[in-house]
C-alpha cells in the first residue's frame, strides 16, 4: 500500500502543476496576421480574442467580404497558435499517456 500512497501524492502534485500551468497559459498571448499584416489578431492562452487590428489600407466599403475573410483567417491562425501553445505547455503532463484532445 506504500506505493499506492506515493502514487496518490504524485498525482496530487501533478494536478497542482497542471493547474498552475493552466493559469500561466491565461497570461500568455499569441499573435497572428493575415493579408501580409493587414489584419492582426491577438489571443490569450485560454482562447480569448484580446485584440483585432485592421490596417486602414484594407478597409474598402466596396469589398467588405475580403476584410471579413482576412479577419477570419487571422483569428483561425491565432487559435491554431493557441492550440500549439497549449500542447507545448500542457503536453509534458500527458506525454506517453495517449490522451488525444485532452487540452
From Swiss-Prot:
Belongs to the YbaB/EbfC family. Keywords: Cytoplasm, DNA-binding. This is Nucleoid-associated protein BH0035. One of its GO terms (cellular component) is bacterial nucleoid. Residues 1-20 have a biased composition (Low complexity). It is found in: Cytoplasm, Nucleoid. The keyword Ligase does not apply. Residues 1-29 are annotated as: Disordered. Its main location: cytoplasm. It holds the Pfam family YbaB_DNA_bd. PANTHER family: NUCLEOID-ASSOCIATED PROTEIN YBAB. Homodimer. GO terms for molecular function: DNA binding. Binds to DNA and alters its conformation. May be involved in regulation of gene expression, nucleoid organization and DNA protection. InterPro entries: YbaB-like_sf, YbaB/EbfC.
